[in-house]
């Protein structure tokens, strides 16, 4: 198992980060356009930039996945079709999806498109993954809170491609289930507008001194790569579409060495 080829999947919040990650050795890049992505406050990509990135990646034998990982309103589906069509024609390699309505819509409207179940779908076991497979998904991003044994079980039962976060920020809540930003700041994380209140300092139990009780340490699995491969993971995903281009290139280069 350890000799199998594993995809190194890097984030890109803008064109500079994209080219940096590609030349640092990423096998694939995931990014968002100017609509329907979970990082609405990233710089993101214009239509022309994104099409250019797809073509450039393909020249080098790399892949590009587009995030469509927010909840979409009924009134927005016609806009979603027009939004995706240029990328579909350019040969976009796959879309990462949260909303099952969006999933069904893209499956029917763009039949050649690869469909990936986002970590925002809260896939925590084999039954959720098997359901997605029956709906037409070829890849799933399990919830970040799963153990390696739970991930291994999903792989063994479903045979699907497994994409897992291996580096970057962690969520204190269940993947895809956090409403903290909506409640505290009126900005919905499930619409790509998370204010990240979990990263803020708070006072606890009447103590005047502020602390960070909800801000988790970032994930780093550089010392666990053999175990990750043995668990059947097919794609190593680096978190960080809100990070600087230097971060995307630097972290990608480090993991590429392994």
Language-model regions: role of each:
Residues 126-127:
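Conserved nucleotide-cofactor-binding alpha/beta core module
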């Amino acid at each position: 198992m350890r000799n199998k080829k594993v995809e190194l999947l890097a984030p890109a919040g803008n064109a500079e980060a994209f080219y940096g990650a590609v030349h640092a050795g990423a096998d694939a890049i995931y990014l968002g356009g100017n609509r329907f992505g979970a990082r609405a406050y990233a710089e993101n990509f214009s239509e022309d930039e994104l099409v250019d990135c797809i073509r450039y990646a393909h020249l080098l034998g790399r892949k590009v996945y587009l995030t469509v990982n927010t909840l979409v309103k009924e009134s927005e589906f016609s806009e979603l079709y027009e939004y995706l069509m240029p990328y579909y024609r350019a040969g976009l390699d796959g879309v990462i999806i949260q909303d099952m309505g969006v999933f069904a819509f893209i499956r029917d409207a763009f039949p050649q498109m690869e469909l990936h179940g986002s970590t925002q779908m809260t896939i925590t076991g084999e039954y959720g993954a098997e359901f997605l497979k029956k709906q037409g998904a070829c890849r799933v991003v399990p919830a970040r809170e799963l153990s390696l044994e739970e991930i291994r079980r999903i792989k063994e039962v479903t045979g699907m491609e497994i994409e897992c976060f291996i580096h970057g920020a962690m969520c204190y809540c269940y993947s895809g289930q956090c409403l903290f930003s909506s409640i505290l700041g009126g900005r919905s994380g499930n619409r790509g507008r998370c204010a990240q209140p979990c990263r803020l300092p708070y006072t606890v139990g009447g103590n005047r001194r502020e602390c960070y009780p909800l801000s988790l340490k970032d994930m780093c699995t550089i010392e666990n790569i053999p175990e990750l491969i043995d668990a059947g993971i097919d794609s190593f995903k680096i978190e960080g579409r809100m990070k600087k281009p230097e971060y995307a290139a630097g972290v990608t280069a480090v993991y590429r060495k392994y």
